[in-house]
Amino acid sequence: MAPEENAGTELLLQSFERRFLAARTLRSFPWQSLEAKLRDSSDSELLRDILHKTVKHPVCVKHPPSVKYARCFLSELIKKHEAVHTEPLDELYEALAETLMAKESTQGHRSYLLPSGGSVTLSESTAIISYGTTGLVTWDAALYLAEWAIENPAVFTNRTVLELGSGAGLTGLAICKMCRPRAYIFSDCHSRVLEQLRGNVLLNGLSLEADITAKLDSPRVTVAQLDWDVATVHQLSAFQPDVVIAADVLYCPEAIMSLVGVLRRLAACREHQRAPEVYVAFTVRNPETCQLFTTELGRAGIRWEVEPRHEQKLFPYEEHLEMAMLNLTL
């Protein structure tokens, strides 16, 4: 195989691996590129490689996605195979048979590979809105913020980090594993989200602060219930964060007003000390929503500037979406 062709195959395998482990929508997979490569090849080796990068990947075997997702993926893979090859590939059909016999679940795993060779795995609800909240799934701005953090570890190293609206926990877990913070506080207001957060912290080998068996070189990790509308300056002062982050929390005007309110109270906590650095990442879905956020920041006396886009693309998220991150000065 020519070097260029080999590199193309490796990129294709990596794309399938990252998307499958993260349980991304099937339409986001590079199916056309796969079909083209299958037509150029007389054997099924590429499909075997894809199978071992996805369904049979060690991370997937330990923490599989939902049964329905794996079944749909394998069905699509078989379609592509049958379109260009007459000889069946037994491994594909055996893997599909396993999913047909497996029991369905409302939870599934999503895994994200880290540059260190490790990974972050999340147990998530298979429904976008579940238990009356959107916090049980990972949104794309959380992946964007995690990438930025991995590229800028000095912002977090040996510092106390407070995350507002942690959701499933992807950003914080990536920071804890890659950026060596002194302490990390995950926070959310919904009880079901907090329960899932605690589970995901433990799933990734981290210990919650009260655990006396916690590793000495690990950050102190806390999962806190925090309702932005009722949190007082006194309650917020207990966190003493050096850095505050949030991702995909600008989904409606009410949330924006609540976020700006809690940021004002965080600023008041440290009147005799340096205010925390604040980074807010979001997907630009509605320009009016973004405009409202910056307007309310101005009214609150909070300065902001757009953080330059980072270079690394580590995680699979929708490339057509516009992402942005603001650096706020309280």
Swiss-Prot record:
GO BP, sorted A to Z: peptidyl-lysine trimethylation
Keyword Membrane included in the entry's annotation: no
InterPro entries: FAM86_N, Methyltransf_16, SAM-dependent_MTases_sf
Places the protein is found: Cytoplasm
Main localization of the protein described in the UniProt heading: cytoplasm
Gene3D superfamilies (UniProt xref): Vaccinia Virus protein VP39
Keywords: Acetylation, Cytoplasm, Methyltransferase, S-adenosyl-L-methionine, Transferase
EC numbers, comma separated: 2.1.1.-
The keyword Cytoplasm belongs to this UniProt entry's keyword annotation: yes
N-acetylmethionine PTM sites in chain numbering: 1
Binding site for S-adenosyl-L-methionine: 139, 165-167, 228, 247
Pfam families (UniProt xref): FAM86 (PF14904), Methyltransf_16 (PF10294)
Reactions mediated catalytically: L-lysyl-[protein] + 3 S-adenosyl-L-methionine = N(6),N(6),N(6)-trimethyl-L-lysyl-[protein] + 3 S-adenosyl-L-homocysteine + 3 H(+)
Any one annotated GO CC term: protein-containing complex
GO MF entries: protein-lysine N-methyltransferase activity
First-level EC class: transferase
SUPFAM superfamilies attached to this UniProt entry: S-adenosyl-L-methionine-dependent methyltransferases
Family: Belongs to the class I-like SAM-binding methyltransferase superfamily. EEF2KMT family.
Subunit note: Interacts with FAM86B2 and FAM86C1P.
Task performed by this protein: Catalyzes the trimethylation of eukaryotic elongation factor 2 (EEF2) on 'Lys-525'.
Full protein name: Protein-lysine N-methyltransferase EEF2KMT
